[in-house]
């Protein structure tokens, strides 16, 4: 994985982080879900544990991540094709 996420999408306290991974056959992407919560008065933490009320929102975030990745894969393929033609 890269040291910096390719993209983050957030709805409220839920977010997905999208990572771009470089492989021999091109880029591939992975998604990490997270839920932020406050411990005490001022310390924010993250967990990958979701409650019942989080599921539909996280489903929407996964849908948005899927769409973003699909567009990136298309852009990656176009760039590879143009690079191959230039060589």
Please annotate each region the language model reported.
Residues 1-87:
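Single-stranded nucleic acid-binding surfaces, predominantly the OB-fold ssDNA-binding core
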């Amino acid at each position: 994985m890269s040291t910096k996420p390719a993209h983050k999408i957030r709805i409220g306290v839920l977010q997905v982080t999208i990572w771009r991974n470089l492989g021999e056959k091109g880029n591939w992407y992975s998604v990490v879900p997270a839920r932020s919560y406050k411990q005490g008065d001022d310390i924010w933490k993250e967990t990958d544990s979701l409650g019942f009320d989080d599921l539909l929102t996280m489903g929407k975030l996964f849908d948005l991540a899927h769409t973003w990745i699909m567009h990136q894969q298309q852009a990656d393929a176009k760039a590879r094709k143009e690079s191959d033609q230039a060589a």
